[in-house]
Design a protein with these regions (language model features):
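A conserved beta-strand-loop-helix scaffold within acyl/acetyltransferase catalytic domains
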Residues: 128-232, 238, 248-250, 258, ...
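Acidic, metal-coordinating catalytic cores used for nucleic-acid/nucleotide bond scission
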Residues: 19, 44-46, 67-81, 107-111, ...
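Conserved active-site alpha-helix within GNAT-family acetyltransferase domains
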Residues: 251-285
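Active-site metal-binding core of divalent-cation-utilizing nuclease and nuclease-like domains
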Residues: 6, 11, 15, 19, ...
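Short beta-strand-loop-alpha-helix junction that forms the active-site gateway
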Residues: 43-86, 182-187, 200
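Active-site beta-strand termini and strand-to-loop segments that position acidic
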Residues: 52-57, 168-170, 332-334
Length: 343
């Protein structure tokens, strides 16, 4: 396969057909190289469609090209999709107990993101090296030091945070898993902290296979709660009584959230706050686009709101909706959240 730094939209339906088949071949190769059984073009009783489906491991994959997954403009022969359609698909998958992974073309054609995407399929199908948390230790360091780790092992890369909790192999000292924490953006001051991002090694000792750290999440969670008894997210003296945690619905179903308290360290509760659809913006190949954006899919950018709105109107910027995020919160027992949000 050939990786692409910038995406170009097809100019006619024949180009689109060739493009779509190419994207599907990339995903198909992952299944076949790992000897994972699959069916193609499956429609379930509730209307959910999957380009690929593995019944044994309850895994569905949808290949999302931009031309047929745009909500702001009619492209070629495709009608605009609804802003909530990917979110609705995610709900349908959950109803069936299926994990739906969305294969966006910019990600499976990206040299770094492709391998993280591949690992998602492998992991769901039980293809991983098992490591036990008892053979690891937790190290607390500034979050920025883990940026290379996230760039290699998380499909979204690194996100700004304050403190990293790193699970390391006791013998080799190599980092295996990490959670970072920082100020909570959700709730505008109602919550003390958020898990900014998590990641696990996706290419253990250059085997092309990632790892599962048995009891790793609960071990990291235990240390975060201990740390939060006397510290703020940035390490200054304080206390963390509430922690927000996000699930990216484009790839995950959130089932692991219920196991965060398995360590039994401290009582408290984990609740689901909200599940909201999302979207990103595809900056088409036009002259007025900034060079850093042309041919790329970007997150929301409030500073460019006027330019983006204009781009929607003239069709030079496309809205690509997605399944969004589910937001959870942990609250220590006996704690009442602040009633008034702070700015």
């Amino acid at each position: 396969m050939t990786f692409e730094e910038r995406i170009k939209l097809p100019t006619n339906m024949e180009e689109w057909k060739i493009r779509k088949q190419y994207l599907k071949s990339i995903v198909r190769d992952i299944f076949e190289e790992n000897k994972i059984e699959y069916k193609e073009n499956v429609t379930f009783n509730n209307g959910l469609f999957a380009d690929f489906y593995n019944e044994q491991h309850c895994l569905a994959v949808e290949v999302c090209d931009f031309a047929s997954h745009c909500s702001s403009k009619k492209i070629l022969d495709f009608e605009r999709i609804g802003d909530k359609q990917p979110y609705t698909n995610w709900q349908k998958a959950n109803e069936l107990g299926i994990r739906l992974i969305c294969a966006y073309e910019n990600e499976i054609l990206d040299q770094k993101k492709y391998f993280v995407f591949k690992n998602m399929i492998q992991y769901q199908c039980g293809i991983f090296h098992r490591v036990f948390a008892r053979n690891t230790k937790v190290e607390i360091i500034p979050a920025l030091k883990m940026k290379p780790f996230y760039e290699a092992n998380n499909i979204q890369g690194y996100r700004n945070a304050k403190t990293a909790f790193v699970l390391k192999d006791k013998k080799t000292e190599e980092p295996l898993m990490c959670y970072t924490i920082g100020a909570a953006y959700f709730g505008k001051g109602m919550y003390d902290c958020e898990i900014a991002r998590g990641a696990c090694v996706i290419n253990y000792h250059n085997t092309g296979i990632g790892i599962q750290v048995v009891a790793g999440a609960s071990k990291l969670w235990k240390h975060i709660l201990e740390y939060g008894e006397t510290h703020n997210p940035d390490g200054t003296p304080g206390r963390i009584n509430s922690i927000v945690y996000y699930t990216d619905n484009r790839y995950y179903d959130g089932r692991s959230i219920g196991h965060l308290m398995d360590s039994g360290f401290e009582s408290g509760k984990v609740e689901t706050l909200a599940t909201t659809p999302g979207f990103m913006n595809f900056w088409d190949n036009i002259e007025e686009n900034p060079e850093t954006h042309r041919g790329k899919l970007k997150n929301r950018e409030p500073a460019r709101h006027t330019l983006i709105t204009q781009g929607y109107r003239n069709g030079n910027i496309l809205c690509i909706p997605n399944a969004g995020t589910t937001t959870h919160v942990y609250i220590r027992d006996g704690i009442e959240l602040r009633n008034e949000k702070t700015n």
